[in-house]
Amino acid sequence: MLRVDQTGTILIKNGTVVNDDRYFKSDVLVENGIIKEISKNIEPKEGIKVVDATDKLLLPGGIDTHTHFQLPFMGTVSVDDFDIGTQAAVAGGTTFIIDFVIPTRGQSLLEAYDQWKKWADEKVNCDYSLHVAITWWSEQVSREMEILVKERGVNSFKCFMAYKNSFMVTDQEMYHIFKRCKELGAIAQVHAENGDMVFEGQKKMLEMGITGPEGHELSRPEALEAEATNRAIVIADSVCTPVYIVHVQSIGAADVICKHRKEGVRVYGEPIAAGLGVDGSHMWNHDWRHAAAFVMGPPIRPDPRTKGVLMDYLARGDLDCVGTDNCTFCADQKAMGKDDFTKIPNGVNGVEDRMSIVWENGVNTGKLTWCQFVRATSSEAARIFNIYPRKGRIDVGCDGDIVIWDPNQSKTISKDTHHHAVDFNIFEGIKVTGIAVTTIVAGNIVWSDNKLSCVKGSGRFVPRPPFGPVFDGIEQRDKVRNELLRKVDRKPYEDDNTKNSSK
């Protein structure tokens, strides 16, 4: 891998700047990693790096809200570590990722956080942040959540409603976690599947002799995702706190989110590249390896309408920002479940191809405008997780994370050319038109001419303050609701014996 001089200074000439609210032709000057000037005809200073972006778009660096790099999971570890994973990210135009700290049940949140941060700090090639999963509940967890928010830069906590006997929390635990999130100004996130019913469905499939990858989707149908999504939103609304549903994979779950949003509930939905780019019919492929490669949770749905409908929701703003749930396992790891689909490590790729998949299926189909694309792949995530406009916008004072995007250049996605460590790509053979030709992180070119020039460990941890825009109006809303909750003044109840004895 090439090493570059990290000056953080670059001048981009003749491009079209695209933010989520407007686009315009301009030059962009980045100095010391920060955008210094945006105007036409900027004269380059002596010795400065100049890049010509004629006929190209200048986009805010992509933000992937959902990755799992080097995750210990289901008896193995995902093969895209923080080095390889962030190389793949920048090769596709993503310059910021938010990974998940996932403590084991009973483990200290702070201990797990410190481990994840150490792994990341040593390897990341772009800036990053960390969500933290809550896999159990106690007074210790409550105290450690406060420390994470106030001292460690965390403003989001995830609950699993699935993975029974592992990560799954009960509804009562989730209620208390949501209350604590509200107190701390952190957004509650939810993996929404009915874990008890999934557990029973898995037993049923195995009893019927369905042991292959198709059993994965059959045991956790769309209805279980939709039901859990509704339940999570109802619980969050009872607490009056914002909730963010991760990896929305089904029409049913998206419908539920849309319904509650129309009723004024503060809920956010995250579709992922897999669900927007392919369908789950691959799990019925006769090649076991091929079928197993598509196993993730919630499943990619086999209904071929799903990816189009999810894109429609994204275009309307009923779903918010696109993540990937990038969690990759090679063939020998997936083969742990060759005789039992419940043992197939769940996870697929996506961090490298996310932006091109959204462009191909959104912009190129006429469903998304350029500005809506930026909203879906960058700016809305920055707002929700309270790092806007530092991230998610091209403007003076913002971080110099910029993608030079060629809307007319094509490529065919393949495991043979991708930058992941995994030996399979779920988007294999898909031709996309619209790709990142140059990726700039903090003013430094890290991807250009189909070559990476990253510096391992050069990325920075970005703390995310609490009480972001998702909490706007929450206090007043809660106050108004509570004013409607009044007791009825009435005389003490007296039965006939009491009445007679008082005479």
From Swiss-Prot:
Per UniProt, substrate binds at Y163, N346
Give the enzyme class: hydrolase
**In the record, which positions carry N6-carboxylysine?**
K158
> Which Enzyme Commission number(s) are on file for it?
3.5.2.2
**Record-level Gene Ontology MF annotations:** dihydropyrimidinase activity; zinc ion binding
Q: Which cofactor does it need?
A: Zn(2+)
- Give the cofactor note text: Binds 2 Zn(2+) ions per subunit.
The reactions it catalyses are:
5,6-dihydrouracil + H2O = 3-(carbamoylamino)propanoate + H(+)
Record's GO cellular component terms: cytosol
Q: Where does Zn(2+) 2 bind?
A: K158, H191, H247
* Highest taxon in the source lineage: Eukaryota
Sites where the protein binds Zn(2+) 1: H66, H68, K158, D325
Q: Which GO terms describe its biological process?
A: pyrimidine nucleobase catabolic process
Maturation and modification: Carboxylation allows a single lysine to coordinate two zinc ions.
For this UniProt record, give its keywords in alphabetical order, as a comma-separated list.
Answer: Hydrolase, Metal-binding, Zinc
The record's PANTHER family line, in alphabetical order, gives: COLLAPSIN RESPONSE MEDIATOR PROTEIN, HYDRANTOINASE/DIHYDROPYRIMIDINASE FAMILY MEMBER
Family of this protein = Belongs to the metallo-dependent hydrolases superfamily. Hydantoinase/dihydropyrimidinase family.
Q: Describe its partners and assembly state.
A: Homotetramer.
Its function, per the record, reads: Catalyzes the second step of the reductive pyrimidine degradation, the reversible hydrolytic ring opening of dihydropyrimidines. Can catalyze the ring opening of 5,6-dihydrouracil to N-carbamyl-alanine and of 5,6-dihydrothymine to N-carbamyl-amino isobutyrate.
Q: Can you name this protein?
A: Dihydropyrimidinase
> Which organism does this record belong to?
Dictyostelium discoideum (Social amoeba)
